[in-house]
From Swiss-Prot:
This is Deglycase PH1704. The active site is at C100, H101. PANTHER family: DJ-1 PROTEIN, DJ-1_THIJ_PFPI FAMILY PROTEIN. Its EC number is 3.5.1.124, 3.4.22.-. It comes from Pyrococcus horikoshii (strain ATCC 700860 / DSM 12428 / JCM 9974 / NBRC 100139 / OT-3). Belongs to the peptidase C56 family. Homohexamer formed by a dimer of trimers that assemble into a hollow ring structure. CDD domains: GATase1_PfpI_like.
Length: 166
């Protein structure tokens, strides 16, 4: 499967690095999309290569979506092309994994009303206001959406997402 990450500078390093390598280990093709080509750097200094820009992404070419957290989602959610990619993939039932602040992109996409999920506790109110039944759990699976809270939840998050991709 082809898996797309939507992110930008100041991503939470382990929330991108771990799923990136875990999904490659499972045999998936993994692509990172951001505002510009080149490299982006996480909050703790880890840099990754950007494969394509948001405006070059065709959501039809991807099978699943990952939304890491950190500070990046605050900026990504302001990019209409990135939000439309997330909206389309989520609405079409493609597997979507979000962690920490990653759901901010889905909130902006307007796709979470009536869904059950989790996030970083600091955006709990935003999730509830978007219509999410927010649960304080290491991982929540609701149909095509797998959500988690913080880096300590990474293993459970990817375990459930990998199951969804099979």
């Amino acid at each position: 499967m082809k898996v797309l990450f939507l992110t930008a500078n100041e991503f939470e390093d382990v929330e991108l690095i771990y799923p990136y390598h875990r999904l490659k280990e499972e045999g998936h093709e993994v692509y990172i999309a951001s505002f510009e080509r080149g490299t982006i750097t996480g909050k703790h200094g880890y840099s990754v290569k950007v494969d394509l820009t948001f405006d070059k992404v065709n959501p039809e070419e991807f099978d699943a979506l990952v939304l890491p957290g950190g500070r990046a989602p605050e900026r990504v959610r302001l990019n209409e092309k990135a939000v439309s990619i997330a909206r389309k993939m989520f609405s079409e039932g493609k597997p979507v994994a979000s962690i920490c602040h990653g759901p901010q992109i889905l909130i902006s996409a307007g796709v979470l009303r009536g869904r059950k999920g989790t996030s970083y506790p600091g955006i709990k109110d935003d999730m509830i206001n978007a219509g999410v039944e927010w649960v304080d759990a290491e991982v929540v699976v609701d149909g095509n959406w797998v959500s988690s809270r913080v880096p300590a939840d990474l293993y459970a998050w990817m375990r459930e997402f990998v199951k969804l991709l099979k």
